[in-house]
From Swiss-Prot:
Classification via InterPro entries: UROD/MetE-like_sf, Uroporphyrinogen_deCO2ase_HemE, Uroporphyrinogen_deCOase
Catalytic reaction(s) noted: uroporphyrinogen III + 4 H(+) = coproporphyrinogen III + 4 CO2
Assembly behavior: Homodimer.
GO biological process: protoporphyrinogen IX biosynthetic process
Name listed for the protein in its UniProt record: Uroporphyrinogen decarboxylase
Length: 353
C-alpha cells in the first residue's frame, strides 16, 4: 500500500489534498550525489547496472522529496535491444551505429524478447521498488516510435531530420514497417515494466515538433495510440502519460489515444490546454526548466502562476506539477527543493471542494 499516492490519484482525476510534483530527468547531473555515482561508471553502464540505476532513481526522493520516482534508464535502450550499437558521447549526446537507411537495414533489426534484452531494466525496477518501500509511486517509460525512428535513421540527434524525412516521404511503406517494429518493442517494454512493478508509465515523443500536423497524424500518432491501447487493455488501472514535446496544436488528438494524462511543454498556456481538453485527461507540467536558474522567490512566483492558471480543481480534473521538459544539469538542487516545497505548501488551496 503506497504511503503517498497523490501522483496516481491526480492522473486518475480523483480528489487530491494538493498537487503532486515530480520532474523529468530528476535523477541526474544537477545532484552532486548523482555525479558521485556517475564518476564510477559511464552512462550506458549506469543504465545497465541495476544496483546503480536503483540508487540514482531513489536519490531525488530522499534528497528533494518529490511525489514520484522515475526509473533511471534511457529511451535509446530500445534501438540497442533491437541490434543497434549505442554510445553516449560526453557533451555530444547519443550515437547509434549503423543507422537504418535501407529496406535491408530495416529487415536486420530484430524484435527481441524484452525480458531477455532489457532484463536489466526490470531488475533495476525490482531493486528500486524495495528501496522505495512504498513511499511513492514508480514511473516506467519508453520513447515514442517516431522519436526512436529518428534516432535509428539519423544515427543520433539531428537539426533537420534529413534522413528520417527522406524515408517517410520517399518510402512511406518502409517507414511504416520500421515504425511498426519499433512500436512492438515499445509496447512489450512498457508491459514488462508494469509486470515487474511500476505504477504508471510515460511515453516520450521528444521530436514530435519535427513533423507537420498531417505527418504527425500519419507517422507518429497511430503508434502512440497502439501502445496506449495495448497497455490499457492489459492493465486498465495503470495510468499512461503521453508527453509529445511542443505538439501544442494536436492536444485533442493526443487525448484521443486513450491516455490518462498529457505532459505539456512550457510554451503553451496551461489554462488554454485545460479549457480545450475540458478535463478529459489530467495535465502534467509545465514550468519552463530555465526558471530554476532564477531566485527561489521568482521560482515560487512563476510556479504560483501555473497553479493559478490551472485553477480550482473539480471532481474530474487532475494536475501533476512538472517542468515543461527535463531539469537542466547545472541547476542548483536547492532551487528545485524550493519549488517542491512551494507546491506542497501552496497548492492545497486549489483543491478545496
Amino acid at each position: 500500500m503506497l504511503k503517498n499516492d497523490l501522483f496516481l490519484r491526480a492522473l486518475r482525476r480523483e480528489p487530491c489534498e494538493r498537487t503532486p510534483i515530480w520532474v523529468m530527468r530528476q535523477a541526474g547531473r544537477y545532484l552532486p550525489e548523482y555525479r558521485e555515482v556517475r564518476s564510477k561508471a559511464d552512462f550506458v553502464t549506469l543504465c545497465k547496472t541495476p544496483e546503480l540505476a536503483a540508487e540514482v532513481t531513489v536519490q531525488p526522493i530522499d534528497i528533494i522529496g518529490l511525489d514520484a520516482a522515475i526509473i533511471f534508464s534511457d529511451i535509446l535502450v530500445i534501438p540497442e535491444a533491437m541490434g543497434m550499437g549505442l554510445e553516449i558521447i560526453e557533451s555530444k549526446g547519443p550515437r547509434l551505429y549503423e543507422p537504418i537507411r535501407s529496406a535491408a537495414d530495416i529487415d536486420r533489426l530484430v524484435v527481441p524478447d524484452v525480458a531477455d534484452k532489457l532484463g536489466y531494466v526490470a531488475d533495476a525496477i525490482r531493486l528500486t521498488k524495495k528501496q522505495l518501500d512504498d513511499r511513492v509511486p514508480l514511473i516506467g517509460f519508453a520513447g515514442a516510435a517516431w522519436t526512436l525512428f529518428t534516432y535509428a535513421v539519423e544515427g543520433g540527434g539531428s537539426k533537420n531530420y534529413r534522413f528520417a524525412k527522406e524515408l517517410i516521404y520517399n518510402h512511406p511503406d518502409q517507414a511504416h514497417k520500421l515504425l511498426g517494429k519499433i512500436s512492438q518493442v515499445i509496447t512489450d517494454f512498457l508491459l514488462l515494466q508494469i509486470e515487474v512493478g511500476v505504477n504508471a508509465v510515460q511515453i516520450f515523443d521528444s521530436w514530435a515538433s519535427a513533423l507537420s500536423e498531417d505527418d504527425y497524424k500519419t507517422f507518429a500518432l497511430p503508434y502512440i495510440k497502439q501502445s496506449v491501447e495495448a497497455v490499457k487493455s492489459k492493465h486498465p488501472d495503470i495510468p499512461v502519460i503521453v508527453f509529445a514535446k511542443d505538439a501544442n496544436t494536436i492536444l485533442t488528438d493526443l487525448a484521443d489515444t486513450g491516455c490518462d494524462a498529457l505532459g505539456l511543454s512550457w510554451n503553451i498556456d496551461i489554462a488554454r490546454a485545460r479549457q480545450e481538453l475540458n478535463d478529459r485527461v489530467a495535465l502534467q507540467g509545465n514550468l519552463d526548466p530555465t526558471v530554476l536558474y532564477a531566485s527561489p522567490e521568482r521560482i515560487r512566483e512563476e510556479a504560483g502562476k501555473i497553479l493559478a492558471k490551472f485553477g480550482q480543481h473539480t471532481e474530474k480534473s487532475g494536475h501533476v506539477f512538472n517542468l515543461g521538459h527535463g531539469i537542466l544539469p547545472d541547476v542548483n538542487p536547492e532551487h528545485l527543493k524550493a519549488l517542491v516545497d512551494f507546491i506542497k505548501e501552496e497548492s492545497g488551496k486549489y483543491h478545496q471542494a
